[in-house]
From Swiss-Prot:
Family: Belongs to the ATPase C chain family.
Keyword Glycoprotein: no
Name of the protein this chain belongs to: ATP synthase subunit c
Localisation per UniProt entry: Cell inner membrane
Chief location of this protein within or outside the cell: membrane
Annotated organism of origin: Serratia proteamaculans (strain 568)
Topology relative to the membrane: Multi-pass membrane protein
Description of how the protein assembles with itself and partners: F-type ATPases have 2 components, F(1) - the catalytic core - and F(0) - the membrane proton channel. F(1) has five subunits: alpha(3), beta(3), gamma(1), delta(1), epsilon(1). F(0) has three main subunits: a(1), b(2) and c(10-14). The alpha and beta chains form an alternating ring which encloses part of the gamma chain. F(1) is attached to F(0) by a central stalk formed by the gamma and epsilon chains, while a peripheral stalk is formed by the delta and b chains.
Biological function: F(1)F(0) ATP synthase produces ATP from ADP in the presence of a proton or sodium gradient. F-type ATPases consist of two structural domains, F(1) containing the extramembraneous catalytic core and F(0) containing the membrane proton channel, linked together by a central stalk and a peripheral stalk. During catalysis, ATP synthesis in the catalytic domain of F(1) is coupled via a rotary mechanism of the central stalk subunits to proton translocation.
Length: 79
């Protein structure tokens, strides 16, 4: 029974890390598309848009990093 609970912990951590990575990839794709759309509509705002794009992209990219940290915690500290 204990092996089953360990396996479920490992699978839960893998699903958590995988879904966070997929969600961030979709979010960055949408964000990049909106950045290009905004840059095409108003080329004079490209420096402002670029700054905001990289700030938000960093925040979106932090989510999978946090999920990896939590997943490793679940796999090695909780187990």
């Amino acid at each position: 029974m204990e092996n089953l609970s360990m396996d479920l912990l490992y699978m839960a951590a893998a699903v958590m890390m995988g879904l966070a990575a997929i969600g961030a990839a979709i979010g960055i794709g949408i964000l990049g598309g909106k950045f290009l759309e905004g840059a095409a509509r108003q080329p004079d705002l490209i420096p402002l848009l670029r700054t905001q794009f990289f700030i938000v992209m960093g925040l979106v990219d932090a989510i999978p990093m946090i999920a990896v940290g939590l997943g490793l915690y679940v796999m090695f500290a909780v187990a």
